[in-house]
Amino acid sequence: MRIFFWKAAVAAVAGLGAAVQAQPFYLPTANHALFVKGGEPDFFAPTPGKTWESGCFGCVRTDRHQMHEGLDIKCLQRDSRGEPTDPVMAAAAGVVEYINDRPALSNYGRYMVLGHNIGGVEVYSLYAHLHSVRSDLKAGVSVQAGEPIAVMGRTSNTAETISQERAHVHFELNLFYSDHFAAWFKTHFPGERNDHGVWNGENLVGFDPRLVFLEERAEGTNFNLTTWLQHRVELCRVLVRKTNAPWVKRYPMLVAQNPTAQKEGVAGYEISLDYNGLPFAWVPRAASEIKGALKYRLLSVNEAEETLNPCRNMVKQVSGRWQLAPNGISLLDLLTE
């Protein structure tokens, strides 16, 4: 069973009381050009030959067919050799969950994951392409919001290295899919290595930090992460005949009440997925509310959203009818196994 280090973080800062629950996210570097009108080119590090949008979160690469699950934030400081020296800071109070100190094992290069409790929501921030991680940090160590945790770099294991000009920190905000990831990975990627256990990026589902930062700045202390997550745009809705989904216990704030299922018992769930595969709304269903015997059934597709953000390939059209694509089925397996 995985130890939830983020719970230790909550205890460590319990003296802050309600302030912990209202803790906003902070930008992970001193680059605050995101908050300057027209400052996006100074904030986002684009891919070679592309505009700043390619450094954003979303279907922003390869003509909208490749997902980029974070923000690439430009460096501000360099040493005499032109290498980045920007401190990377914790985006919120939390606990170190994982450090990969072997850049060759991931296209993230050297990266680390912090766990946070934001108003009761279990959130994980990820910082990648790091030059170095603070030497005293290891899994289980608490950090405060804005505390330096690493130095920006350009580490990676990809064939095309990150140039000095493009030096950046890749930053993500994520929810956590499943403690059963290792078994799922072995089934769906036979023969492939998983060097990072549950902290493999495939087991973290991102939401757009840019939108969070901007809305948080606009709303101040009125910003509520749960409400924000509950109002994601639906790409598709599916019905699953499974009742043991770990997500339901980890994120109960995203599960609706259904009197019929409460009375008769839960036989499955109706799940709303955004375009990145984040299951932001779950409705328990009783057996009397479920038609057919299929394990998974696609209920609806938001065609406008699928056209705008097709990069996850979770659904497909066959002879004019929408179906779950292999990627969509694989995701549902991860959520419900």
Please give the residue ranges for each predicted region.
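Hydrophobic helical h-region of N-terminal Sec-dependent signal peptides
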Residues: 10-15
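Conserved, short, structured surface segments that act as functional micro-motifs
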Residues: 106, 111-114, 141-218
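Short, well-ordered loop/turn sites that connect or cap secondary structure elements
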Residues: 91, 137-143
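Zn2+-dependent peptidoglycan hydrolase active-site motif and core
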Residues: 83-85, 91-134, 164-168
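Surface-exposed, glycine-biased beta-strand/turn segments
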Residues: 22-110, 195-337
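Bacterial N-terminal signal peptides that target proteins for export
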Residues: 1-9
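Short beta-turn/strand-loop junction motif enriched in small, turn-promoting residues
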Residues: 78, 99-102, 132, 154-158
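N-terminal signal peptide c-region/cleavage motif recognized by signal peptidases
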Residues: 17-19
